[in-house]
Design a protein with these regions (language model features):
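Internal, well-folded beta-alpha domain core
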Residues: 90-244, 249-253
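C-terminal accessory regions
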Residues: 1-2, 179
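Active-site helix-to-loop segments that bind/position phosphate- or nucleotide-bearing substrates
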Residues: 2-92
Length: 253
């Protein structure tokens, strides 16, 4: 069973957590070419392309200009610090947790494509609609689709053919998602709040649950999809009367 989790815009600058090993991103070369190109942009262009403030644009210009400083590298699972990662709590993982995650978790990234948790990466900011000379003018969604679709399918098939989809739907566009769903069994847990007359998905809760469920799978060494039904978080519980086999619902009353 493989897990797919989205990267986050917010990133850490350092970590003191020990990890059992370090690995290299599969698409380090492509990421380096992108970083080299972005390091030549001015802050105004970065603001426009990354849809961010001047301060964030300046911070990321500096990041891209120091992209080859190995002292700034972090394991991907500890580099991100968005809402999902606050609930993943990887800084509390044991060495065995990290080892299990390395074999079972993929993290999507606009800059690096697809990462394993212990791949060493540099902090960055990127958007999927950015077009670069290095991509021959394609946006990153289109560029990565050619690389990542087969990679993900082959990795899932090499395991047990099951993918737990805990990434945001935006990142599906990095793949030929229709083909992924045809070739492997994709299970996408969904998280809702019961509003009485309807159920509603609230982004912050969904992100929290995705991170917490990833942690739950890793720390409990889960290898059967039905075992995720035991997941609970702050009132979110499996609701068997909702959804279906491929879209299990977890609802907070």
């Amino acid at each position: 069973m493989q897990i797919l989790l989205a990267s986050a815009k917010i990133m850490n600058a350092a970590t003191s957590v020990d990890i059992p090993m370090k690995s290299k991103p599969k698409f380090q070369e492509q990421a380096g070419l992108f970083a080299l190109e972005l390091s030549t942009w001015d802050t105004n262009r970065l603001m426009k392309e990354l849809k961010c403030s001047q301060a964030i644009a300046l911070e990321n210009l500096q990041r891209y200009q120091s992209f080859w400083n190995e002292e700034e590298l972090l394991p991907s699972i500890l580099a991100y610090y968005g809402q999902a990662y606050k609930y993943l709590q990887a800084d509390n993982f044991s060495q065995d947790d990290f080892a299990f995650a390395q074999d079972h978790l993929f993290i999507t990234s606009f800059l690096y494509g697809l990462l394993r948790p212990l791949d060493m990466i540099h902090p960055y900011r990127m958007e999927g609609k950015v077009r670069l000379d290095a991509t021959k003018g394609m946006n990153l969604f289109a560029f990565w689709k050619n690389y990542l679709t087969n990679m993900l399918i082959e990795a899932v098939k090499a395991n047990d053919g099951i993918l737990i989809h805990l990434a945001t739907e935006e990142f599906e566009h990095l793949f030929d998602w229709k083909r992924v769903c045809q070739e492997v069994k994709v299970i996408q847990p969904l998280f809702y709040v019961d509003k009485g007359d309807t159920i509603k998905m609230l982004s912050v809760h969904a992100k929290s649950c995705r991170g917490a469920m990833t942690k739950f799978i890793i720390q409990n060494r889960i290898d059967q999809p039905s075992d995720i039904f035991n997941f609970e978080l702050n009132g979110f519980r499996y609701a068997p009367n909702y959804g279906d086999e491929l879209h299990p619902h977890f609802i907070k009353k």
